[in-house]
């Protein structure tokens, strides 16, 4: 059985140890001969890499492990790139969240002006990774779960249309794990779903068990009462996420024929979100004080002790979808998965060039979309507005256009007026001068 070589792009990420543990747990399904880390921040990556080196030696000593800041070393002789980069790190995420809040607009990592700001930083970084992969390992595939996935996917469609890149998001998976728990199922894989939308902007339209029984009525009853707020074993859910999962019941009420993605909260209830935000302490601060501190602390402890035996780092079970996706490509498994792909008729009454999130059958040639047919006017109207925000953002990046970025922010449902959009944009330009292209 062939053993694979992978590079994790974003080696210094707080998610990297959990992903490495998940890969090591799945070696029977997806054998690995080599794991490489690549990051452009050597110091940050080193802390994570030293710990992962020990973890790999203890759990799978035959795997060759390399960490580097050199693209040629990282991207030569690989089968898969697993990409989760955050250009500007959490310090810039904090600005993405706090700048809009100063103007009375919600501040969120991937939604509204904050998401647009993050997108403008991410495009260049992801395109650079695609180019390294194609230069040094032209037969490799990139599994990209870098945020904001919608803007990144549109950018790769426009700028690298023939590249072997699969854009995927774990949020629907996280919600499906909760749905399965609510329905008393062993796994989300016991459900067969139909879903359509854009990334962080979609709806489940049909959920059945493997025998074809409709699970939507039972789910509707529960979601109408508690949203998606259920206890998941081994998952430590922070207060801000509990609020999001509970608020899903209000999002659901707007169209009870479907099940919503939780991110719709930011578009339907922006006033509520602003009211419940602390402009001086946002989600970025929560992450820096919580997960970032914990992961880096644990990694330093592993390096000091020389063993990971008592480590509290845990497997990122969520991330097992990455193995499912890699296996689908490697072994032609025809796995059914939600991916972000060019619409091209999957949603018959929607822009064929839009990057939509729909179920696909994935094999060694990539994804084949499952047609979702016509979508209702309500969702279509919302999606046309949102996809225009994403397309204008990518055009603004490509053309260095201030005008188009102002239009993109103005068009976001989260922003009340063009004058507020302009004020936010001017502040974001100042904050991002080391990261964005120059806008004229």
Swiss-Prot record:
Site residues (Increases basicity of active site Tyr), renumbered to this chain: 109
Positions with a binding annotation for substrate: 93, 147, 283
Q: Where does Mn(2+) bind?
A: 169, 200
An example of a GO molecular function for this protein is: oxidoreductase activity, acting on the CH-OH group of donors, NAD or NADP as acceptor
Does the record carry Zinc-finger as a key word?
A: no
Q: Cite the active-site annotation.
A: 170, 263
Question: Which family is this sequence assigned to?
Answer: Belongs to the glycosyl hydrolase 4 family.
Subunit comment? Homodimer.
User: In its UniProt entry, what is this protein called?
Assistant: 6-phospho-alpha-glucosidase
What species does this protein belong to? Leptotrichia buccalis (strain ATCC 14201 / DSM 1135 / JCM 12969 / NCTC 10249 / C-1013-b)
